[in-house]
């Protein structure tokens, strides 16, 4: 009898480890937080940005479509790890000097809070065993955004509007990435 209970516990333990991404936070909170972050970002819009500056930034710092393509083909844990890194990089970027940005500071703080909670929630889903080293290309991409757009344009309101648009694209892409896991479960 004791052996049978041990085998049942072992089986349940192994099965649970195999489906470690069955995470309550991801299943119940991710979509809400994702929607909140996108809504907050939309309230931060500044319509005074010149479209010629948009074209200039696109040539300087191209959106990393290839990285998202690779991530979409990765394991579930690697998808979440990639998403957590993107959210962490967004938080670092928005922590820079934003005194010239057109949005209210409270909105920006709320946005940072939601993005940080998203990253922490997803981090709890992948557990400590899956914290691989960061994707250097993702890190370098965000560093280029900081240098070429923010610093290059003097942290102006226009530079922050370009960053806001770029980050919205990232948030939509990571939402798609994580949503693919939600529909798969």
Residue ranges and their predicted role:
Residues 19, 38, 42, 49, ...:
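Eukaryotic basic, amphipathic alpha-helical target segments in cytosolic regions
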Residues 135-185:
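Eukaryote-biased recognition of C-terminal alpha-helical segments
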Residues 34, 76-79, 131, 138, ...:
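Intrinsic-disorder-associated interaction segments
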Residues 67-130, 135, 142:
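Extended, amphipathic alpha-helical segments that serve as helical scaffolds
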Residues 23-88:
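Mature extracytoplasmic or organellar-lumen-exposed domains after removal of signal/transit peptides
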Residues 2, 11-29:
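N-terminal signal peptide
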Residues 1-3, 179:
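Eukaryotic intrinsically disordered, low-complexity regions
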């Amino acid at each position: 009898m004791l052996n049978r209970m041990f085998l049942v516990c072992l089986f349940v333990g192994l099965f649970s480890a195999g489906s470690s991404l069955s995470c309550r936070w991801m299943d119940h909170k991710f979509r809400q937080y994702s929607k909140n972050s996108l809504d907050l970002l939309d309230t931060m819009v500044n319509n005074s940005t010149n479209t010629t500056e948009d074209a200039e930034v696109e040539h300087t710092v191209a959106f990393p479509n290839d990285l998202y393509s690779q991530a979409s083909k990765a394991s579930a844990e690697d998808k979440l790890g990639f998403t957590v890194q993107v959210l962490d990089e967004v938080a670092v970027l928005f922590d820079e000097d934003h005194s010239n940005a057109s949005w209210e500071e409270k909105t920006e703080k709320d946005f940072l809070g939601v993005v940080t909670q998203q990253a922490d929630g997803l981090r709890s889903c992948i557990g400590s065993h899956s914290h691989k080293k960061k994707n250097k290309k993702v890190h370098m991409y965000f560093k280029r955004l900081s240098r070429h757009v923010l610093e290059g344009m003097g942290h102006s309101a226009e530079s922050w509007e370009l960053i806001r648009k770029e980050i919205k694209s990232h948030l939509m892409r990571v939402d798609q990435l994580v949503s693919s896991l939600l529909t798969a479960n």
